[in-house]
């Protein structure tokens, strides 16, 4: 289920736009995740006290963590599927420490696509959305494989 060179170009073109304000995009992604799937908020001790969108928008910690999440994802996307070295420590921490299910990775993938569509509609048409969907599915599938190696069925 690899991506073609053209698909990777579409993914990385829009990702370049994300990187111009990675913390802002990350904050928007996490807020979207928490609003559409409130159960995911329980996995974040640091944020579970945030009940409203205004509280989330005002949280410097949430904005910072959003940047961390998207920076890690960006380093994986830039490897165009050759991301073993970047993926292994991320999978290990998410499997053994944070216990983040693959379902939650699906939810954040949906949030990422929604935020990119709303912020960059001119650069994120149907082809780019499909390519990003494939890239995020590749990421999730590889995370699931690593989870099993760490004994987490996630």
Swiss-Prot record:
Stored PANTHER family: MYOGLOBIN
GO molecular function: heme binding; metal ion binding; nitrite reductase activity; oxygen binding; oxygen carrier activity; peroxidase activity
Species the sequence originates in: Tachyglossus aculeatus aculeatus
UniProt subcellular location: Cytoplasm, Sarcoplasm
Modification sites for Phosphoserine: 4
Main localization (coarse): cytoplasm
Binding-site positions, heme b: 94
Signal peptide: none
GO cellular component: a single term: sarcoplasm
SUPFAM superfamilies tied to this protein: Globin-like
Protein name in the entry: Myoglobin
Superkingdom of origin: Eukaryota
Transmembrane segments: none
Binding-site residues for O2, renumbered to this chain: 65
One GO term of the biological process aspect: removal of superoxide radicals
The protein's Enzyme Commission number: 1.7.-.-, 1.11.1.-
Reactions catalysed: Fe(III)-heme b-[protein] + nitric oxide + H2O = Fe(II)-heme b-[protein] + nitrite + 2 H(+); H2O2 + AH2 = A + 2 H2O
Protein family (similarity comment): Belongs to the globin family.
UniProt keyword Heme present: yes
Globin domain sequence ranges: 2-148
Residues annotated as binding nitrite: 65
Subunit note: Monomeric.
Alphabetic keyword roster: Cytoplasm, Heme, Iron, Metal-binding, Muscle protein, Oxidoreductase, Oxygen transport, Phosphoprotein, Transport
EC top class named in words: oxidoreductase
């Amino acid at each position: 289920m690899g991506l073609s060179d053209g698909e990777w170009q579409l993914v990385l073109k829009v990702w370049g736009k994300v990187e111009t304000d990675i913390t802002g995009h990350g904050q928007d992604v996490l807020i979207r995740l928490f609003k559409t799937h409130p159960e995911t908020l329980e996995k974040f001790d640091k944020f579970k006290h945030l009940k409203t969108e205004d509280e989330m928008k005002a949280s410097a910690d949430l904005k910072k963590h959003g940047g961390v999440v998207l920076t890690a994802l960006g380093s994986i996307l830039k490897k165009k599927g050759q991301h073993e070295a970047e993926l292994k420590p991320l999978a290990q921490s998410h499997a053994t420490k944070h216990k983040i299910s693959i379902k939650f990775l699906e939810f954040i993938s949906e949030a990422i696509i929604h935020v990119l569509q709303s912020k960059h509609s001119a650069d994120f048409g149907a082809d780019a959305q499909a390519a990003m969907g494939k890239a995020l599915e590749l990421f999730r599938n590889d995370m699931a494989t690593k989870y099993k190696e760490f004994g987490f069925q996630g």
